[in-house]
Amino acid sequence: MAKNIKDIANQYAKAIFELAGEQDNVDEVLTDLRTIKTVLDENQNFITIASSADVAIASRDDLLKTLTGNSTDSVKNLVKLLQVNNRLNILSIVVDEFVSQYNEVNGIVDVQATTAVALDDGRLDKLASVFASKTGAQQVNIENVVDESILGGVILQSQSTLIDGSLQTKIAKMKAQLLG
């Protein structure tokens, strides 16, 4: 049975996470991978060029050495392994999977707070505290997204939890009760 790309990326991420744990440099590997992801996000054609058969092998190797720069040996080896296996196209997904594993192990949760108006940092910090107390998260990284269609209130959403306190949902529930 063929595996999907996310499963394959997860295997690479799990392997480098375990290796980093054994070498006691998980935080350093995380920093290196995030730096690489930033470079890839800012240079959309990087992987295409670094994988192209039209580009000389030495030039592709130089590109990858530039990408990994001062990274740990395990990160350099990961990128080289992906290149050898013709899987450079999943490097960003591998980074995302590594970050997910790191966050899970460290009790870190990424939360999207959807509100009708932008919130200041103080209110976002309070929402993060509420979310942490309700879910048991050690740390909450909160991002505010403005969506005027929710009318008011807030929707807090992580990968596994949804807390919908939006005015739009409350109105819809009242309407259903009145009509039901």
Curated annotation (Swiss-Prot):
Keywords: ATP synthesis, Cell membrane, CF(1), Hydrogen ion transport, Ion transport, Membrane, Transport. One of its GO terms (molecular function) is proton-transporting ATP synthase activity, rotational mechanism. GO terms for cellular component: plasma membrane; proton-transporting ATP synthase complex. It is found in: Cell membrane. It is a peripheral membrane protein. InterPro entries: ATP_synth_OSCP/delta_N_sf, ATPase_OSCP/dsu. It comes from the Bacteria. Its main location: membrane. Gene3D superfamilies: N-terminal domain of the delta subunit of the F1F0-ATP synthase. Pfam families: OSCP. F-type ATPases have 2 components, F(1) - the catalytic core - and F(0) - the membrane proton channel. F(1) has five subunits: alpha(3), beta(3), gamma(1), delta(1), epsilon(1). F(0) has three main subunits: a(1), b(2) and c(10-14). The alpha and beta chains form an alternating ring which encloses part of the gamma chain. F(1) is attached to F(0) by a central stalk formed by the gamma and epsilon chains, while a peripheral stalk is formed by the delta and b chains. Belongs to the ATPase delta chain family. F(1)F(0) ATP synthase produces ATP from ADP in the presence of a proton or sodium gradient. F-type ATPases consist of two structural domains, F(1) containing the extramembraneous catalytic core and F(0) containing the membrane proton channel, linked together by a central stalk and a peripheral stalk. During catalysis, ATP synthesis in the catalytic domain of F(1) is coupled via a rotary mechanism of the central stalk subunits to proton translocation. This protein is part of the stalk that links CF(0) to CF(1). It either transmits conformational changes from CF(0) to CF(1) or is implicated in proton conduction. This is ATP synthase subunit delta.
